[in-house]
A protein has these predicted regions:
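A contiguous, well-ordered beta/alpha segment that forms the leading edge of an enzyme domain
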Residues: 1-177
Length: 178
């Protein structure tokens, strides 16, 4: 499984309301690795921007996502938040703050069906970097599952979008991998 991006036109449209058909001569493809998988980009490049520059820009964007929001990277702001003590406030990098605002918007809009605070439940089922002992991917022990449920719920996440700060209520673990 890999990450695939939709067609993107390098250089922009003169009038975005009237896109032109891509010239097959300027369609290009490149790829790389991120998050334990591969990514692929096929795009219309009428200005023939150097492929190395485009690839490096895409890779740098993905690397920023990993550096800020990966629960697999122990030094990421997300991982530090997940390990933090109750009552601590965390200033998020701007990109992470935008993602958090979107995640909480969709959590509310979906009635909690999309919930960025599911880290304890994911771990209880034996997935992710914090997979719990006794939670091996089989049906979890009912006590472990109840404890994980008590630590989840997007409503517990006190996020201030104007300041870009997120309060750790205690035991919350954000997982944006979903």
């Amino acid at each position: 499984m890999g990450i695939s991006f939709s067609t993107w036109r390098a250089g922009g449209y003169a009038n975005a309301a009237t896109p032109r058909a891509a010239d097959p001569a300027s369609l290009q493809q490149l790829g790389g690795e991120t998050m334990g998988t591969t990514w692929s980009l096929r795009f219309d490049n009428p200005r023939m921007l150097p492929l190395r520059a485009v690839r490096d820009a895409v890779q740098a964007s993905l690397d920023r996502v990993v550096a800020q929001m990966s629960h697999w990277a122990p030094d990421s702001p997300l991982s530090r938040y997940n390990r933090a003590s109750a009552g601590s406030t965390h200033l998020l990098p701007p990109e992470f703050a935008r993602v958090m605002a979107c995640a909480l918007y969709w959590a509310e809009a979906s009635g909690g069906a999309i919930d960025p605070s599911v880290g304890p439940l994911v771990a209880c089922w034996g997935f992710g970097p914090a997979a719990r002992a006794g939670c091996s991917g089989a049906v979890p022990d009912p006590r472990a599952l109840a404890e994980a449920r008590a630590r989840t719920g997007w409503e517990r996440l006190a996020f201030d979008p104007a300041q870009g700060t997120l309060l750790q209520p205690g035991g919350a673990e954000i997982d944006l991998s979903g």
